[in-house]
């Protein structure tokens, strides 16, 4: 693997471009500070992203901060908010204690947990998807998104048309069901409640929201119905305990209820998905399971010549990620997406726009061939590409010239002049090749 020496925590300069190897993969985690359009390394990383075909994403709470949802570990994150809220009742070492499965041993902690989760749920209900969420949806629209693995529990992706793994997947025909998933929720879904006994999930209701707001976890209606049915039939109640409803999220110290399914799906993505780029956004990668996910994807992507990048404002520990993550871009995720829009605008065209542009180019090519055939048939010399582009009418071909003018007008609306798409580069290359084999004239050279 060709290596690039990691830069110190300072911005790279364009003068490095002459020393850059052909491969952008690194043996040690390298840092890119800020979003400088003149940064040669950043420019090349961006270009490789635009050319990738199967992109995997891993997201954390950092991509939802601009939607008004706090992250976990920052100075104003969820852990600190919980710690401040609880300080008037008792002293806790970390807000993380309120997200540990052991809290269900203490009725008082359950009450605080219920109140806090209802506040977070209400906050999520008002939140709107960020630019980063929409970027992930755009990857799907371009048929470039392999899968998005998210640690977030807000489910904002669903509101922009992405399919979430918030329901249990059938074990039969697993691969076809997994293929239709856009987002895999690694830590559960705040928008549903689950029973602690029968594990049935339910959408929130106003009544249950009021219960949690009072610090109470409601009883499971399915468990109650089963017990009442057995009592009416004169049968034993099988332990009699009724489950309680809690937010359907994964707490520290408990396993994901769909852990085996997610592992099976990840292996399917690695073996058959052929990922060639991994974008990690808005996470400091502290959770062990997430670390393993990144390492597995990294090996496959590096074997295929791809890159792994992390976009996050907070630095991560370097030594544990050498040879796994190539670059950390120190930036807000939404700002990075805005930077991409300015650097690779064609990448952000919709699939429909691209199809229309290709169709117009094919039609224009067919019309040029028709014009050439008609001119050859009447013994006139072929018109140079420059004159055709200028729309110079030749007697008997007015109708064809009018069609070409119309096509060029529509094309300009779809593809703005300032954008330099790969398709334009190919077309310009073809034009230059044709020019090499044609005699040049003084007035054409002056043009």
Curated annotation (Swiss-Prot):
- Region annotation Disordered: residue ranges? 1-21, 365-393, 411-447
User: Which keywords has UniProt assigned to this entry?
Assistant: Cytoplasm, Metal-binding, NAD, Nucleus, Repressor, Transcription, Transcription regulation, Transferase, Zinc
Biased region (Basic and acidic residues) positions are 365-375
Per its record, what are the GO molecular function terms?
A: histone deacetylase activity, NAD-dependent; metal ion binding; NAD+ binding
Keyword hit for Chloroplast:
no
Question: CDD domains in the record, alphabetically?
Answer: SIR2-fam (cd01407)
Q: Where in the cell is it found?
A: Cytoplasm; Nucleus
Required co-factor? Zn(2+)
Q: Which residues form the active site?
A: 187 (proton acceptor)
Set out the biological process GO terms recorded for this chain's protein.
DNA-templated transcription; mRNA transcription; rDNA heterochromatin formation; replication-born double-strand break repair via sister chromatid exchange; short-chain fatty acid metabolic process; subtelomeric heterochromatin formation
**Classification via InterPro entries:** DHS-like_NAD/FAD-binding_dom, NAD-dep_sirtuin_deacylases, Sirtuin, Sirtuin_cat_small_dom_sf, Ssirtuin_cat_dom
Q: Which reaction does this enzyme catalyse, per its entry?
A: N(6)-acetyl-L-lysyl-[protein] + NAD(+) + H2O = 2''-O-acetyl-ADP-D-ribose + nicotinamide + L-lysyl-[protein]
Q: Which residues bind Zn(2+)?
A: 195, 198, 220, 223
- Function field: NAD-dependent histone deacetylase, which contributes together with HST4 to histone H3 'Lys-56' deacetylation, regulation of telomeric silencing, proper cell cycle progression, DNA damage control, DNA recombination, and genomic maintenance.
Q: Which family does it belong to?
A: Belongs to the sirtuin family. Class I subfamily.
Q: What else is known?
A: Present with 319 molecules/cell in log phase SD medium.
Protein's name in the database = NAD-dependent histone deacetylase HST3
Q: What is the lineage of its organism?
A: Eukaryota, Fungi, Dikarya, Ascomycota, Saccharomycotina
Gene label? HST3
């Amino acid at each position: 693997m060709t290596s690039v020496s990691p830069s110190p925590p300072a911005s790279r300069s364009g003068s490095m471009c002459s020393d850059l190897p052909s491969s952008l993969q690194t043996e040690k985690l390298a840092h890119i500070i800020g979003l400088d359009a003149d940064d040669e390394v950043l420019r090349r990383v961006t270009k490789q992203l635009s050319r990738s075909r199967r992109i995997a994403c891993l997201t954390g709470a950092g991509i939802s901060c601009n939607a008004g949802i706090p992250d976990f570990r920052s100075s104003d994150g969820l852990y600190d908010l919980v710690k401040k809220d609880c300080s008037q009742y008792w002293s806790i070492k970390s807000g993380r204690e309120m997200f540990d499965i052991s809290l269900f041993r203490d009725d008082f902690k359950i009450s605080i947990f219920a109140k806090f989760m209802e506040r977070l749920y209400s906050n999520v209900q008002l939140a709107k998807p960020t630019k980063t969420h929409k970027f992930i949806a755009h990857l799907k629209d371009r048929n470039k998104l392999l899968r998005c693995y998210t640690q977030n529990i807000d489910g904002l992706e669903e509101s922009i048309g992405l399919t979430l793994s918030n329901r249990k997947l059938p074990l039969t025909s697993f691969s076809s069901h997994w293929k239709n998933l856009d987002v895999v929720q690694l830590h559960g879904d705040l928008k549903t409640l689950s029973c602690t006994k029968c594990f049935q999930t339910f959408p929130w209701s106003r009544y249950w929201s009021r219960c949690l707001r009072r610090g109470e976890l409601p009883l499971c209606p399915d468990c109650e119905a089963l017990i009442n049915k057995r009592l009416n039939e004169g049968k034993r109640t099988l332990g009699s305990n009724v489950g309680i409803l809690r937010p359907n999220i994964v707490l520290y110290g408990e396993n994901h209820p769909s852990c085996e399914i997610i592992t099976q799906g990840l292996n399917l993505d690695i073996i058959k998905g052929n990922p060639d780029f991994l974008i990690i956004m808005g996470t400091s990668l502290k959770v062990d399971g997430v670390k393993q996910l990144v390492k597995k994807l990294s090996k496959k992507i590096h074997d295929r010549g791809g890159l792994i990048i992390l976009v996050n404002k907070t630095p991560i520990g370097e030594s544990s990620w050498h040879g796994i993550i190539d670059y950390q871009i120190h930036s807000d995720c939404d700002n990075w997406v805005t930077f991409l829009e300015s650097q690779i605008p064609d990448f952000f065209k919709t699939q429909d726009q691209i199809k229309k542009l290709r169709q117009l180019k094919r039609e224009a090519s067919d019309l040029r061939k028709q014009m050439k055939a008609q001119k050859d048939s009447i013994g006139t010399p072929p018109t140079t590409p420059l004159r055709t582009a200028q729309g110079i009418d030749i007697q008997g071909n007015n109708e064809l010239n009018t069609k070409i003018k119309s096509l060029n007008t529509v094309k300009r609306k779809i593809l703005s002049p300032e954008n330099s798409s790969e398709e334009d580069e190919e077309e310009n290359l073809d034009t230059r090749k044709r020019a090499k084999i044609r005699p040049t004239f003084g007035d054409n050279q002056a043009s």
